[in-house]
């Protein structure tokens, strides 16, 4: 079913979740509590006629804080009071805890410590192994090599063919970032059917 014209709520109902690159403003509202920020992407605490079950919301937020080792004063803490790394752990944890069918995650470990990065990687792999589709967008090639089954590169507005992770090297990805794949924008003769 095409989702291009579907609203955010419809996409969420179908199991699509997203971790944006911009933490404050897109991933969390800076002036709202962590509990209230749950409502940006999670609807479990909503009741009939739009009522919010505040206790359920606090419990949900507390669970994310605990499971992802987020250092915060509690679910009532405002988002802007967290360090960048702790806010990242909270946003990623919020989306992972939704058990999405499809997760698009940009820069999943940006600003987090090594231990938290390992936990996030393990959770992303666990979600994938449970049958979800996980699309990771990252500038960290080592992170992509660790998480991906296959890689794509976007260069000059064009999407590369899939590259199995086992065949990926820093050098090859570097070439592809310049559009140098068979049929890529850096090889116009290949697009026309000439030798690559």
Stretches with model-predicted labels:
Residues 1-196:
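Glycine-rich phosphate-binding loops of nucleotide-dependent enzymes
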């Amino acid at each position: 079913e095409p989702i291009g014209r579907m609203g955010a709520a419809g996409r969420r109902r179908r199991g699509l979740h997203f971790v944006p690159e911009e933490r404050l403003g897109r991933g969390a509202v800076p002036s709202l509590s962590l509990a209230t920020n749950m409502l940006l992407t999670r609807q479990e605490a909503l009741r009939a006629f739009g009522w919010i079950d505040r206790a359920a919301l606090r419990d949900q937020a507390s669970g994310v804080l605990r499971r992802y080792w987020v250092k915060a004063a509690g679910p009532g803490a405002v988002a802007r009071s967290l360090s960048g790394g702790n806010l990242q752990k909270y946003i990623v944890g919020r989306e992972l805890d939704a058990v999405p069918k499809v997760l698009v995650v940009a820069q999943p470990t940006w600003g987090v410590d090594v231990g938290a990065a390992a936990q996030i990687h393990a959770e992303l792999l666990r979600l994938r192994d449970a049958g979800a589709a996980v699309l990771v967008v990252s500038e960290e090639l080592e992170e992509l090599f660790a998480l991906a089954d296959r890689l794509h590169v976007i260069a000059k507005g064009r999407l590369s063919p899939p590259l199995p992770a086992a065949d990926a090297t820093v050098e090859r990805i570097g070439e592809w970032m310049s559009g140098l794949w068979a049929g890529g924008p850096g090889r116009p003769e290949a697009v026309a059917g000439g030798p690559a």
